[in-house]
């Protein structure tokens, strides 16, 4: 199922974004240029995640237009993963903001 594939890719992008921002924070003082690169990579991964998330939303909306509401089980799973992904995305964005605010 394509939505499962997209959800897995969203998870990967979030994990990568988190890893990059944590590296950026870790190396900010000792290696500022490399830390900035890690920050930029974290931003890029979040951009990928947002594109994938939008695609999931588009697929659900297309399903609604063509055949009506998706099965309840599918929507329950989507809502669970959506909440999980948005929580992780918020935590990453907070860390990205902290990185930019640190002197």
Tell me what each language-model feature is.
Residues 1-103:
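Non-heme di-metal
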């Amino acid at each position: 199922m394509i939505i499962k594939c997209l959800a897995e890719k969203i998870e990967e992008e979030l994990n990568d974004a988190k890893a990059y921002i944590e590296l950026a924070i870790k190396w900010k003082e000792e290696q500022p240029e490399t830390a900035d690169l890690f920050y930029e990579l974290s931003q890029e991964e979040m951009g990928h995640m947002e594109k994938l998330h939008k695609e999931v939303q588009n697929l659900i909306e297309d399903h609604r237009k063509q055949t009506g509401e998706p099965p309840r089980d599918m929507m329950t799973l989507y809502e669970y993963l959506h909440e999980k992904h948005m929580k992780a995305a918020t935590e990453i964005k907070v860390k990205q903001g902290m990185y930019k605010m640190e002197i």
